[in-house]
C-alpha cells in the first residue's frame, strides 16, 4: 500500500504536465524520490530521449501486456497512415567552439550575443584605430549582415566606435583564443571553416583598410557569452536534446504536441 501511495504521488504530479497544454509542477524534495517509477522514467528517457511523462503514467496502473496488444493491433494501420506524409530529411551543420567571450557587455542582444548569417573578420593583430575597421563595417552594413570581429584584441577608438555603432549595426568583438603560435593556428582553423582570410598573417599582404567582401568569413549562426556557467537544469536540457536527436536520426520523428496521435486516432476509428 505504501509503495502504491508513492507511485500515485509521483504519477499524479507528473500526469498534469502531459501534452501541449501541460501545467508546471513544483515539488519540494524533503525525502527520497519514488525510485521504482523514477527508474521507469529514466530508462525511457535514455532509450527514446522523451516520453518520461507517458511512461510514468503507464507505470502507475496500466497493464503493459494489454497496451502492447492494443499497439500491435493498430501498428500496421498507423505506419501506413504516417507513411503518406513521410519525408527523409537529415541536415548536419559543422561548427566550432572556443573559450573566449565578447570584449564588452554592450555587445549583447539577449542574455548572450547571438547572430545569424554573419560576416567574420579575423586578425592576428590588435585593432585600435577606427580607420582599420571602417571598411569592414561598411561592407557588413551594405550587405545587411552582422559582423563578428575576432582579433588579438580590440581597444581604444576602435572599440568605442563598435560600441557606438551597435545601435545601427549588429557587431561584436571577440578576443582570439590561445597565445602565440596556438592562437595563429586557431585563427587559421577559423579561416578555413568560414572561408575567410586572416589579416596580419605572415606571408599574406592583407591590410584591414583594404578588406573586400570575399576576405570576410561567413557563418550561419554564432553565440557569444561573457563566460560559461553550466547548471544542472541546462545539463538536463542538453541531455534530453541529445537523446531526442539520436532517436530522431535512428527512427525519425512525428508532429509533436499530440498532433500525430490525434490524426492517427481519427484514422483508426474510421477503420
From Swiss-Prot:
The gene is HSPD1. Homoheptamer arranged in a ring structure. The functional units of these chaperonins consist of heptameric rings of the large subunit Hsp60, which function as a back-to-back double ring. Interacts with 2 heptameric Hsp10 rings to form the symmetrical football complex. Interacts with HRAS. Interacts with ATAD3A. Interacts with ETFBKMT and EEF1AKMT3. Interacts with MFHAS1. It comes from the Eukaryota. ATP binds at residues 50-54, 257. It is found in: Mitochondrion matrix. GO terms for molecular function: ATP binding; ATP-dependent protein folding chaperone; isomerase activity. Gene3D superfamilies: GroEL, GroEL-like equatorial domain, TCP-1-like chaperonin intermediate domain. This is 60 kDa heat shock protein, mitochondrial. It comes from Mesocricetus auratus (Golden hamster). Its EC number is 5.6.1.7.
Amino acid at each position: 500500500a505504501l509503495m502504491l501511495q508513492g507511485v500515485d504521488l509521483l504519477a499524479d504530479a507528473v500526469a498534469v504536465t502531459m501534452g501541449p497544454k501541460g501545467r508546471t509542477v513544483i515539488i519540494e524534495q524533503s525525502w527520497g524520490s519514488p525510485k521504482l517509477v523514477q527508474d521507469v522514467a529514466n530508462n525511457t528517457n535514455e532509450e527514446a530521449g522523451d516520453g518520461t511523462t507517458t511512461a510514468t503514467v503507464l507505470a502507475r496502473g496500466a497493464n503493459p501486456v494489454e497496451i502492447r496488444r492494443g499497439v500491435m493491433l493498430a501498428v500496421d494501420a498507423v505506419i501506413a497512415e504516417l507513411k503518406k506524409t513521410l519525408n527523409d530529411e537529415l541536415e548536419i551543420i559543422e561548427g566550432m567552439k572556443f573559450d573566449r567571450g565578447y570584449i564588452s557587455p554592450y555587445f549583447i542582444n539577449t542574455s548572450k550575443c547571438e547572430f545569424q548569417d554573419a560576416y567574420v573578420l579575423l586578425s592576428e593583430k590588435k585593432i585600435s584605430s577606427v580607420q582599420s575597421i571602417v571598411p569592414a563595417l561598411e561592407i557588413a552594413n551594405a550587405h545587411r549582415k552582422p559582423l563578428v570581429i575576432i582579433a588579438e584584441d580590440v581597444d581604444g577608438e576602435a572599440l568605442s566606435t563598435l560600441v557606438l555603432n551597435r545601435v545601427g549595426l549588429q557587431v561584436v568583438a571577440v578576443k582570439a583564443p590561445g597565445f602565440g603560435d596556438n592562437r595563429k593556428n586557431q585563427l587559421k582553423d577559423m579561416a578555413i571553416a568560414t572561408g575567410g582570410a586572416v589579416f596580419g598573417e605572415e606571408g599574406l599582404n592583407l591590410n584591414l583598410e583594404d578588406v573586400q567582401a570575399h576576405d570576410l568569413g561567413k557563418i550561419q549562426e554564432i553565440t557569444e557569452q561573457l563566460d560559461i556557467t553550466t547548471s544542472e537544469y541546462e545539463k538536463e536540457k542538453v541531455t534530453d536534446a541529445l537523446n531526442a536527436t539520436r532517436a530522431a536520426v535512428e527512427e525519425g520523428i512525428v508532429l509533436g504536441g499530440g498532433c500525430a496521435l490525434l490524426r492517427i486516432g481519427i484514422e483508426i476509428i474510421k477503420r
